[in-house]
């Protein structure tokens, strides 16, 4: 891959897909004759102009291109490996540098796609659309008593952490209320008019309700006709294996006593050695999950936020270690019936250090909907610096100070910035009320640590008379204080905070990262 075109596969496949999809909106595109009747029905439902005009929601151009590129790569071109896909969509790229050697490696010896989409542009809807496409085609093949290796009813969705994991469960199973998930609040049910023709909805609803397995149910829960497993990547990664083991082997040399003990008792119990009962239980469970997934005849893995699990640093280099080992084990023996679909806004590894540091993009990127394109489409926010003459000349210290008794207190600069932000919030609340009364802007204050966040909350109460309901503190201290049971409702409220009038202000200590919907924050 050249520096001029670091994403040759995405460029080549997009050009081919756009050619095949000319006339997609009126039903005359060539692609309709190149796919199964099931896929053609879905494409018409998703993209025919007459149908799109009848509903409130539709896929935006970035989502549309991601879905179409995936279908062309997997169903139309039917490439069994990444190398085969390059030969059909970007053959010239194989002549550049080490591309051929890279894509011919064992870890790419199956269908493997990376969808590069900016954060906040609806990757989950693309994931759900592709899952539905796979499921319904697998159903059609089974009904015809046929085997089509391109399609499966077994799915594994991997999240980068617990917040996104919970969001994925919400998307498929519905919101958790009083310990029970309400399927009617799931994305699949709420946006059924987008995803599915009416005659196919109950089929998909039944599959989701009957086959979803949370991370502690994988391999244990009985599912009737497939699998929809959702987990965070830590359950599957070989995270306990040391990444950097420097040493010299000396056969025949006397062994140290601790080495003899380690040979006889490889696990030394105790938290200090990393072998608490909780850790040992997780290792045992992980082994069972990997064995179960490896035993499946076919599987599609949807990997959300893929950049998180490819990054393992060793001597200044970032390489694929932890996650790739597990994937290779699961994929073994499946051939083209193992499919990997990665979603990431930043699908690259940082290689080198200092002046030699550079980005090496994943070779399996098949679509590129980057941040600039998303901003031009109005799908993500752009930052605006609000210059104010009245505070421009003031020295604004952005960190807390201490009073005469050594207790932390807000600096005058912090107070000025909070006042300015709250003034902006009140203006936005007035403006929003005239445009969409059901959307409520919020003010987000990010503090340096948990000693400062209570000071900020108190400032809003004292300065502006805001109640506890109007100011929500979101940090590890608050979570520890409340406990998981009382914290869960707060976390759920954050997921759709812009639908509620209160809270007006959210005070955080860098907890709002992956999974927090940026559409909700306006100040």
Q: What are these language model-derived features?
A:
Residues 1-523:
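RecA-like P-loop NTPase motor core of helicase/translocase proteins
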